[in-house]
Amino acid sequence: MRQGLVPKKVFFTSGVGRHREMLESFEMALRDAGIEKFNLVTVSSILPPDCEIVQKSEGLPSLYPGEIVFTVMSRNSSNEPSRRIAASIGCAIPKDPVKNFGYLSEHHSYGETEQYAGMYAEKLAENMLFTWTKEKPGKTMNISKTAEVDDEGNWTTVISAAVFIL
């Protein structure tokens, strides 16, 4: 059976950036998350079977600056003073993660706490897995980042990402 570009590992990261320019606030969020030096390609929401979840500190050295890297990313930006923004990734891991795939969900919102946004994303992933398999996941998790726009109205960007390693 043909097997294309299937990630072997994944790590989770998040970041926040602030700047008077929107694009530069995104760059600052990527830097804060530690993934600014890669050419990121966003993909949809499948956690492949037998994909090992590793710490960011283990995953980053496996990647090369300029490399095309696949990611499931949630991103949110605003320059509205005092606006709270959130970006979250939820993950639902099947009971048998070696044989079965799981789900990743992206959630971005306004006004939510980091905990609420993270749990919402986690529930989204859990529901996507359940509606496919009719089974509860073996485990769920999330990564979330929130920030509040400063009083000067500088652009603020938050990101959360599941970063795949082939």
Curated annotation (Swiss-Prot):
Which residue positions does UniProt flag as site: Cleavage (non-hydrolytic)? 44-45
Which EC numbers characterise this protein's activity in its record?
A: 4.1.1.19
Record's keyword terms, sorted:
Decarboxylase, Lyase, Pyruvate
GO molecular function terms attached to this record: arginine decarboxylase activity
**Do you know which Pfam families this protein is assigned to?**
PvlArgDC (PF01862)
Which cofactor(s) does the record list?
pyruvate
What GO terms describe the biological role, i.e. biological process, of this protein?
arginine catabolic process
Signal peptide stretch: none
The cofactor binding remark recorded in the entry reads:
Binds 1 pyruvoyl group covalently per subunit.
The UniProt similarity line reads: Belongs to the PdaD family.
| The protein's name | Pyruvoyl-dependent arginine decarboxylase
What is the scientific name of the source organism? Methanocella arvoryzae (strain DSM 22066 / NBRC 105507 / MRE50)
Lineage, opening ranks: Archaea, Methanobacteriati, Methanobacteriota, Stenosarchaea group, Methanomicrobia
